[in-house]
Amino acid sequence: MDKPTTSAAAAAAQDSNLLPDSPQHGPTLSSASSFEALTRHDPNLSRLATKMFNKTEEYITHELNAPLEDYKLLEEMNKATIAKYKDMRQIAENLNTSTSELSLKFQQLAPMMQQIDEISDTVDKLEAAAYKLDAYSIALENRVKCVLQRKSGGGQVAQ
């Protein structure tokens, strides 16, 4: 073998000495692989390895998709919450408008309600006066009857 003439060639030759050797093909690029591409191997082992890699791929795919699904769920929840708050805001605005209208109507009716209260007080006073007048008229009627009975009764006794 020729000796390397450049420092890069020397480093490559030294690195090739550090690589583990394959029993059949010499130095390999992977220290973790015992699989020889051109060598016959156990088909059951190959099937199990393929199944393991497929299951691992499926597991990792689901593990990576789980946060994505969580974010999609959060997004849907946020959209639903936004819609609910929008509805609640509309309801609050409608309530505010209705309350303002009712307050305005109450303010417009307040003088009329005061007049109704005054009329009610006047009617109560008038009713009290009517009862007094009725009592007075009954008393007066009784006096008149007494006077008439005396006149009619006194005149009959004198005859």
Curated annotation (Swiss-Prot):
UniProt GO cellular component terms: BLOC-1 complex; BORC complex; gamma-tubulin complex
Polar residues: bias regions: 14-36
Residues covered by region (Disordered): 1-37
InterPro entries in alphabetical order: BLOC1_su2
A single GO BP: autophagosome-lysosome fusion
Pfam families, sorted: BLOC1_2
Keyword hit for Coiled coil: yes
GO MF term list: gamma-tubulin binding; protein homodimerization activity
Keywords: Coiled coil
Domain of life (superkingdom): Eukaryota
Coiled coil: 69-134
UniProt record similarity statement: Belongs to the BLOC1S2 family.
Assembly information from the UniProt record: Homodimer. Component of the biogenesis of lysosome-related organelles complex-1 (BLOC-1) composed of Blos1, Blos2, Blos3, Blos4, Dysb, Muted, Pldn and Snapin. Interacts with Snapin.
Stated role: Component of the biogenesis of lysosome-related organelles complex-1 (BLOC-1) involved in pigment granule biogenesis.
Record-given protein name: Biogenesis of lysosome-related organelles complex 1 subunit 2
UniProt lineage: Eukaryota, Metazoa, Ecdysozoa, Arthropoda, Hexapoda
